[in-house]
């Protein structure tokens, strides 16, 4: 590692380019301990290693005695301790709670430290001050944010098939607007997107899905009325066609509202998930249909990394967000950084995002890993003669900070820090 570059990257004020952080009272309502910090992602590795669903649920339940949970947790922890998910927790334990090694002697005193630090201001202490984060792009689907420098990314799709009527009733109540047909729902969508702007939203979030055929407004209006009347529209894939139509309309609204479309691509949290349905190349028809919209494609498209790099290189309306990928597979992240640095324009990349809901401490760990990985990868580019030191330093500044202001331009209107 080039020490000078490493020190620069570690000290740099940076953007946390993807979180789901809830308002702090959600974290403060829990009595956290050392095992609970593994609940969001590392618990998936425990399950993958063979822990039963029942034991995993018990191990992550703070209401169960810590001693019992440790007995369940410890054997499987030995199998997962070197995965990226566990490394993020271990980094947080070391830097924030003074625990160099989690074992029979340290789990109880470390848990006491974690509980004692679970106080108001925890997000700013761990991410803002200790983590040197100056801006958070936060997809908690709420207007309420945990810190003043966190800005909401909200829902692109207002309706989906599984909860159609419940969601519609919620929107009608929230906005005091009665929906009777497709035209009136499209009018409601416009009202909602204006509300997004009033509440400092900087982007809208969707998930990559297999492309559906295109239908016209007349056909969509017929489907809408049938669904509204709790009837199934005729045709095997009609629901997918209808919701694809609505998604296209939402993307058009996002473009007109200057909201970036953030897209989950690739790997899914959990176990036994079919993540092929969210493959990054499924996005290509949408990217072509909406050249005026901005798409920030998440998670390096893992495991389809080369495809993600190719899409970012080939499409003028795409940026590539490496959030979470540095936790899923740290080594793959570093290999990708080296490839991206020499293939994708430097203004199209966001380097990291913690991607947690109630775990600003674990996000700190994931972001610290990302900085170290970025430093190693760019040091390799210097060593190989592909980048000079000054070029690598400039690249890290763009990826970690300044690119966020062009990829999410609404941030410029609200951010309490200067570009």
Q: What does each model-found stretch correspond to?
A:
Residues 18, 136, 204, 254, ...:
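Conserved, mostly hydrophobic/aromatic
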Residues 13-26, 261-266:
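Histidine-centered catalytic micro-motifs
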